[in-house]
């Protein structure tokens, strides 16, 4: 029997519904239950793939090629359960599906309305592919009271009634702010937020209250009284030093016990939180510190690189060091001598991105890492910049560039619209809906024997990683570039697409066409990030 937990948020945005959902999933897993997490986003975009990183933050790509909300990254990192395209639905996608059905005549001439047609489609999205699971946790994006959220709230209200209280639970995340002038925590915002939920017919069974200090017992009982929940169901969510401490903090506050009590399940035994305690201990008590310069385009909003920042932290956990990130706008390196800012860093990372702006600075950062023997990791666009730098400065091809920036004399990076996926040829068209010409999702790569990257992957001959890009390194320049010293150490199974490059005579220099950060977890750091930080530790001891 599958049980559903619906997580909503109120008062203000950015309270951490994604972390709360992921933490509850981790706690239920620690008690032996199977879980799946889903996110419903109330915006009209079909998916976040075409949204500006400054508007939305990172686009998290799943194995099956879905471009999804960054919260799905939290779900995967906390639970280890790989998300799919079924785990993220937007208003745009729901409306597109309903309109397509109406055009096909599926509704038999009925007047198509928000209720029941849109709400039914939302319920179908929630219930899809859940057989055999113990728990499905569904996060509703946005803030209660927003007009955009109303169809989703109505859908989960209906679903709560249809499933019944033994199979459905409503959890509401709110803010209990501290007012310095009054010297006390204020419960009124939470009361009003719950009132908004009641206006749409939802009575929450539990409140998670974000606060920066403990909630006095009297205030906790006051919240319970006015919001019509048990005092034990008012769960304080205190600020902690690292997000990986949240599952422990929530358990100590009674979150998982109260959820199990609601469903009539055993809740007295202690969950196994050993791996979370070990992670927190390592983060709190590192044996050293390394500085990594992240030379990117969207550094003004760090959510644009959410998975990347977490993956670097995971690399630090694997090596028992703190990773200090120096976020650098690549455009500054287009000024003469500015690249000297990288003196003293222990590693340089150039992440993914799109467009020509800032590419000159990224190429300068690549050159600095190559010439100074500083550990380097280039991801997606970062690998392409490494190839262009090698072509211009080592292979005698000063006109080398990418066709992404316009026509060029030496297109060492270009657009491909078809490639092999398994035994089939996959084609993308610019007018298509799913990313257009984007190469999305998990693809295999073969690693060259004796290469650094093969050693990093534990001598694996074949790997599978997630991609999100339109442009590819041109295989026709392989011989020229390898003669100049840049080794093509990973290729697509058909040998036509360069996936990994490295310098054999460099202490640690790897560029990858895929996004390894999307598969890294705190309890299972990705080998590339563990290896990169290990190389940075060695660099730290040299300088």
From Swiss-Prot:
Positions annotated to bind CTP: 13, 146-148, 186-191, 222
Activity: how regulated: Allosterically activated by GTP, when glutamine is the substrate; GTP has no effect on the reaction when ammonia is the substrate. The allosteric effector GTP functions by stabilizing the protein conformation that binds the tetrahedral intermediate(s) formed during glutamine hydrolysis. Inhibited by the product CTP, via allosteric rather than competitive inhibition.
Positions bound to Mg(2+): 71, 139
Binding, ATP: 14-19, 71, 240
Disulfide partners: none
Protein name listed in UniProt: CTP synthase
Any GO BP: 'de novo' CTP biosynthetic process
CDD domains registered for this protein in UniProt: CTPS_N (cd03113), GATase1_CTP_Synthase (cd01746)
Pfam families: CTP_synth_N, GATase
Chain sites annotated for binding L-glutamine: 54, 353, 381-384, 404, 470
Miscellaneous remark of the record: CTPSs have evolved a hybrid strategy for distinguishing between UTP and CTP. The overlapping regions of the product feedback inhibitory and substrate sites recognize a common feature in both compounds, the triphosphate moiety. To differentiate isosteric substrate and product pyrimidine rings, an additional pocket far from the expected kinase/ligase catalytic site, specifically recognizes the cytosine and ribose portions of the product inhibitor.
SUPFAM superfamilies assigned: Class I glutamine amidotransferase-like, P-loop containing nucleoside triphosphate hydrolases
EC number assigned by the record: 6.3.4.2
Molecular-function annotations in GO: ATP binding; CTP synthase activity; glutaminase activity; identical protein binding; metal ion binding
Start and end residues of each stretch annotated as Amidoligase domain: 1-265
Catalytic activity field: UTP + L-glutamine + ATP + H2O = CTP + L-glutamate + ADP + phosphate + 2 H(+); L-glutamine + H2O = L-glutamate + NH4(+); UTP + NH4(+) + ATP = CTP + ADP + phosphate + 2 H(+)
Active site per UniProt: 380 (nucleophile), 515, 517
Function comment: Catalyzes the ATP-dependent amination of UTP to CTP with either L-glutamine or ammonia as the source of nitrogen. Regulates intracellular CTP levels through interactions with the four ribonucleotide triphosphates.
GO cellular component, one term: cytosol
Organism domain of life: Bacteria
SUBUNIT field: Homotetramer.
Binding-site residues for UTP, renumbered to this chain: 13, 186-191, 222
């Amino acid at each position: 029997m599958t049980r559903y937990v619906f997580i909503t948020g109120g008062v203000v945005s950015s309270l951490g519904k994604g972390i709360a959902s992921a933490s509850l999933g981790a706690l239920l897993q620690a008690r032996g239950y199977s879980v799946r997490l889903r996110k419903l986003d109330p915006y009209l975009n079909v998916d976040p793939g075409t949204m500006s990183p400054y508007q939305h933050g990172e686009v998290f790509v799943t194995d099956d090629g879905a471009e999804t909300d960054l919260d799905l990254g939290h779900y995967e990192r906390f639970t280890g359960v790989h998300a799919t395209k079924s785990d993220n639905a937007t208003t745009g996608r729901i409306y597109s599906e309903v309109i397509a059905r109406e055009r096909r005549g599926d509704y038999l001439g009925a007047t198509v309305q928000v209720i029941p047609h849109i709400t039914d489609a939302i319920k179908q999205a929630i219930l899809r592919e859940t057989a055999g699971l113990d728990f499905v946790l569904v996060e509703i994006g946005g803030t209660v009271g927003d007009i955009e959220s109303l169809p989703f709230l109505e859908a989960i209200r209906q679903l709560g009634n249809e499933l019944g209280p033994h199979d459905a639970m409503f959890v509401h995340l709110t803010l209990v702010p501290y007012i310095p002038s009054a010297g006390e925590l204020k419960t009124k915002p939470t009361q009003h937020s719950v009132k908004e939920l009641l206006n749409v017919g939802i009575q929450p069974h539990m409140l998670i209250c974000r606060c920066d200090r403990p909630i006095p017992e009297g205030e906790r009982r006051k919240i319970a009284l006015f919001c019509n929940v048990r005092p034990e169901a008012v769960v304080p969510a205190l600020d902690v030093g690292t997000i990986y401490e949240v599952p422990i903090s929530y358990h100590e506050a009674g979150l998982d016990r109260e959820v199990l009590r609601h469903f009539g399940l055993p809740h007295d035994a202690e969950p196994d939180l050993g791996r979370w305690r070990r992670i927190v201990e390592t983060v709190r008590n590192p044996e050293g510190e390394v500085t990594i310069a992240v030379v990117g385009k969207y550094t003004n909003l760090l959510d644009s690189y959410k998975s990347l920042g977490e993956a670097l932290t995971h690399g630090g956990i694997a090596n028992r060091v703190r990773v200090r990130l120096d976020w650098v706008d690549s455009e500054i390196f287009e000024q003469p001598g500015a690249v000297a800012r990288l003196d003293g860093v222990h590693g340089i990372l150039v992440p993914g991105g799109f467009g020509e702006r800032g590419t000159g600075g990224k190429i300068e950062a690549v050159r600095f890492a190559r010439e100074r023997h500083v550990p380097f990791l280039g991801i997606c666009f970062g690998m392409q910049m490494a190839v262009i730098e090698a072509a211009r400065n080592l292979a005698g091809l000063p006109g080398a560039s990418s066709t992404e920036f316009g026509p060029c004399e030496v297109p060492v990076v270009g657009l491909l619209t078809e490639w092999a996926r398994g035994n089939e040829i996959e084609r993308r068209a610019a007018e298509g809906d799913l990313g257009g010409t984007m190469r999305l999702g998990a693809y295999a790569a073969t690693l060259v024997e004796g290469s650094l990257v093969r050693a990093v992957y534990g001598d694996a001959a074949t790997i599978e990683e997630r991609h999100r890009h339109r442009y590819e390194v041109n295989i026709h320049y392989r011989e020229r570039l390898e003669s100049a010293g840049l080794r093509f150490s990973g290729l697509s199974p058909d040998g036509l697409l360069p996936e990994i490059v490295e310098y054999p005579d460099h202490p640690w220099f790897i560029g990858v066409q895929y996004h390894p950060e999307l598969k890294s977890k705190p309890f299972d750091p990705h080998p590339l990030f563990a290896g990169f930080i290990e190389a940075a530790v060695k660099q730290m001891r040299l300088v």
